[in-house]
Amino acid sequence: MLEAKNILVGITGGIAAYKTVFLVRLLKKAGANVKVVLTQNASTFVSPLTLATLSENPVGIDFTEISEGSLSWNNHVELGLWADYMIIAPATAHTLSKMANGQADNLLLVTYLSAKCPVLIAPAMDLDMFKHPSTKTNLNTLSKNGHAIIPVGNGLLASGLSGEGRMAEPEEILEFLINYHKIFSYI
């Protein structure tokens, strides 16, 4: 279903980032071409090397990187144009706020603002953060902007609390993307 589709995965700095490693693997198994952009904070939760290996592409973290002894520029516009779909998973409350307000202070956010493709967002945060009116406002804004919000799960959270806020499981995100693609590829 996703054969030769270009999927750009954006990973933000939340504990649920570990799930996104498996999502990258599932996307590749489904036949997609995958590129990954991490926030600096996300790189403390998941290894860029692991993601580069699984995606079979270099991972973007910053606007510039040192590769093979020279400095190269990560072109966010090219990344945004390359993608058929962009999935941001996990999307923390911090990043949701920045996205809803058009802030562009890291590679992931400037790529998001440059993307011409559908954007799918998988929120992940603690129960109280998820239920906060500011978070609901940001999610509503992003939804009104045409982005697909992947429903959060309900269960045990990293904080020890139980409730809404868990990032959807990788299989659920893949299924959401496939269904989204089926619906909107005919329009």
Regions found by a protein language model. Name each.
Residues M1-L120, L127-I187:
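A cross-family phosphate/adenosyl-ligand binding-site feature
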